[in-house]
């Protein structure tokens, strides 16, 4: 069968680098002013969903930094689902987070804990558990170790909500269903941080210049993505056939590019807070071969075959049958 991935991987609309003029249309003010940068911006139309298992100390630090960044900078909703033997988040992260954020900023956070002795972290299923709780028009599938420039968040949401003028046809708006808020290529900044450095980052009102030990690295399809929530659910959310780690990011991009032809990418950087990796977050996990076979199968599908698969695959049918509150 013909492989359709190559042409779809390149069929993305590239957004020019963000300028104050572009973002000021969203926040209605000039974001170059320091007092504006310290403001909390409105992202009520977006819910961030973050799957979590804290296996290392640096992972604990990363989720704390990420949540402080999101909750201080944006009026938004964040759902964190933690699956583990016991809740390290409740024991160690939540008290520090409450100390760092005022009560009104914590209102947007929902923490769900599911007790499990299972070693395997079924990331795709956990993401879907949260996705089907989302009631906002935009959803961001968000890794716990990721930071974006502050301006990237409202611009990505605005693209989905309000479209992009003249992106494909002169004088017409184009509405992406998925936005990758970072460039493809060496747009990843790998951050090797310390407690002292992230504390300085937070206290400096999130000045990324604080991080002096980083290197540029490849960025493709992981980290985080903004979705039109309705479309995300209609096309199956995350494929629960992918277990633990491996190939789910590739398949997700291929699926939405192939079926919707409405995937946008921003020419911006993504910051990744580095961390130690267990088998659940690397290619030596026991499910990697099954994941690879599923990816090989799906990337050989044509558009109508992919649509048929996601209309009929068991987990997605069960999810869509859940009544909406």
PLM features: what roles do these ranges have?
Residues 88-133:
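Active-site-proximal specificity loops/subdomain of glycosyltransferases
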Residues 123-128, 145-146, 153, 220-224, ...:
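Conserved glycosyltransferase catalytic-site signature
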Residues 65-77:
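Short, acidic, metal-binding catalytic loop of nucleotide-sugar glycosyltransferases
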Residues 2-32, 41-43, 58-62, 219, ...:
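C-terminal catalytic/acceptor-binding lobe
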Residues 136-149:
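Short beta-strand-to-loop acidic/aromatic patch adjacent to the donor-nucleotide binding site
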Residues 131, 149-240:
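Conserved catalytic core of nucleotide-sugar-dependent glycosyltransferases
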Residues 46-62, 73, 81:
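A conserved hydrophobic helix/loop-capping motif in glycosyltransferases and polysaccharide synthases
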Residues 55-56, 81-97, 146:
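A conserved acidic beta->alpha catalytic loop
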């Amino acid at each position: 069968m013909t492989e359709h991935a190559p042409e779809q991987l390149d069929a993305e609309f590239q957004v020019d680098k963000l300028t104050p003029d572009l973002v000021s249309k969203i926040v209605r003010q000039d974001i170059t002013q320091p007092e504006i940068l310290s403001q909390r911006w409105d992202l009520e139309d977006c819910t961030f969903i973050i799957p979590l298992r804290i296996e290392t100390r640096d992972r604990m630090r990363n989720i704390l930094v990420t949540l402080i960044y999101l909750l201080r900078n944006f009026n938004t909703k964040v759902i964190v689902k933690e699956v583990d033997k016991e809740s390290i988040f409740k024991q160690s992260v939540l008290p520090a987070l409450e100390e760092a954020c005022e009560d009104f900023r914590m209102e947007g956070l929902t923490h769900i804990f599911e007790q499990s002795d299972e070693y395997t972290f079924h990331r795709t299923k956990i993401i879907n558990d949260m996705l089907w709780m989302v009631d906002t028009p935009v959803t961001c599938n968000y890794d716990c170790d990721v930071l974006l420039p502050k301006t990237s968040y409202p611009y990505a949401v605005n693209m989905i909500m309000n479209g992009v003028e003249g992106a494909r046809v002169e004088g017409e708006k184009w509405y992406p269903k998925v936005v990758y808020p970072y460039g493809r290529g060496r747009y990843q900044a790998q951050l090797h941080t310390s407690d002292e450095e992230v504390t300085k980052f937070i206290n400096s009102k999130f000045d990324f210049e604080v991080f002096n030990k980083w290197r540029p690295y490849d960025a493709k399809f992981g980290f985080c993505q903004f979705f039109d929530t309705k479309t995300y659910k209609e096309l199956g959310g995350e494929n629960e056939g992918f277990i633990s780690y491996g190939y789910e990011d590739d398949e997700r991009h291929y699926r939405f590019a192939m079926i919707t032809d409405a995937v946008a990418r921003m020419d911006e950087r993504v910051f990744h807070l580095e961390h130690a990796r267990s088998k659940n977050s690397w290619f030596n996990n026991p499910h990697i071969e099954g994941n690879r076979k599923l990816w090989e199968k799906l990337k050989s599908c044509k558009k109508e075959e992919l649509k048929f698969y996601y209309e009929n695959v068991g987990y997605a049918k069960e999810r869509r049958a859940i009544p909406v509150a």
